[in-house]
């Protein structure tokens, strides 16, 4: 946050995981089901290891509540969430948060173009973050 802004206004720090208990959603991709909060925390953990600043990490409401899905049999809702994940989360990681660290962030796929990352996500799911991403990050969160 800009130092001039901090001097002029009061603000309260809210941790990146505050209120995550209010957000419940699942996402099915590449034949596996994942919890939204756990997957975003795993992504945050990987980003932190890559020394991405905390203000670039994903909060629980990075994806709007309207896309959250609790019914793993609701294919339409899941398709919408997968689409939002690709078009919002992956684009944010590719274009902004991990722009200088694409090789390490997307180590499980061809990261030369955003479209290649999206195609790989459709095929491999969260393995785009590395073959061991689910075991190294997701299962430890």
Model-inferred region functions:
Residues 1-141:
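C-terminal regulatory/interaction module of P-loop NTP-utilizing enzymes
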